């Protein structure tokens, strides 16, 4: 090192030390011109070296300026320079005697990062073993079982308490139930028991709610295998059985029945049939086969053919309906013809007429939700026993010609009220706990709560209300009993002291409630074609209208 003419003490490595101002300055050549950096050796009020300054060559317009800190500032709060160019000032450094807050230092609740979710098929032996079936009165029934509902905190829940979320979005149970569930250890937040329902939720919070689950019965009719090879499994789906878990259904679904009774696992549904629709249903055995056939669907290489029985005398000539279809509510699963809807096309041909109803062959050329049912309603010939689109809730004309003298909110209110009175909310893929505001969402599923005029839909069936009224007086005692039950292997019990459903007596559905006269008859694609037998109600001599 040596002194130069300007009083700089030169140091190897392009560093210079200013004897007049205790600081180091380093210069070097950059891509955009000369670069310089100054580091002060003075100890600031924080007890450390002053921050360095850096200039970026000619691009910044100040390459020739060498910055060095001025004289020490008096102790006290430093005045920050005004932001340049509208930029927000950066956070100030801690003052004298202050330390930067460390995470969790103020007992603030720390949320662990979300776990990586499993991809692909999610049902295996551990899921199939949760419970078992039994058969009674022509029905397949599921023994009640314990089940963990798991979810990450939704955006609309952030900043709200658990108490608020349960009281506004999970109304299947009274708040007294959730308080008892906390005492019984049924509610967990980030894998730790919830101690207080007033805890405020944060982003990435992981919720686990252990419930005693009851599933609705379905037909005892077996699922018949139509074909099986190394690529696909094709079955004849009975009416009333959902394809995959949804709503209150889990084990009483085609996916679970095939896994439990036929050891057919890791199946990929290639298309969907409504719960009350019967007929040809295809599954791929691998993701590669699934992608190949879905590509054929997108390229319109597949042909689907259905048969149905409709009201009245359908025209003898072929009828093509191209009316667009709009989803009124994703939650309820209701659609209607509307100019704002997506383009659809269905071709109809009458097969027979028995004087009261007609058997009609249907060829959907597009694949919209409830397409056949909605188009038949528009044509004035709804499916004979369609519980949604042949309902008086649509008005006197039952939606013929697209005439519906109600708003979407009024339509949904009347549909839900009708099926609630019949205790048949499963037809709408609903249970009592789903009856909260926000049933109308015609553009997409909404994350916001719905309108106040749907508040009346939050009421459960009368029997459920009676149980809820009695619950607060009983749940304190029940919670203690539940804690002891857990200790004695409650997971094997079919009754649960906290479960309101266990104290209800529900009537079994009638056989006619488990069938809709819509059947998937044929499914054809490149290199394959599968048929299902014509159902009894589609025969020419059928006379049970």
From Swiss-Prot:
Keyword check for Phosphoprotein, yes or no. yes
Instruction: Give the span(s) annotated as Disordered.
Output: 48-121
The record's Gene3D superfamilies line, in alphabetical order, gives: Pseudouridine synthase (3.30.2350.10)
Q: Which reaction does it catalyse?
A: a uridine in mRNA = a pseudouridine in mRNA
Instruction: Write out the entry's keywords from A to Z.
Output: Isomerase, mRNA processing, Phosphoprotein
Active-site residues? 274
Q: What is this protein called?
A: Pseudouridylate synthase RPUSD2
Q: Name its species.
A: Homo sapiens
For this protein's source organism, the top of the classification is: Eukaryota, Metazoa, Chordata, Craniata, Vertebrata
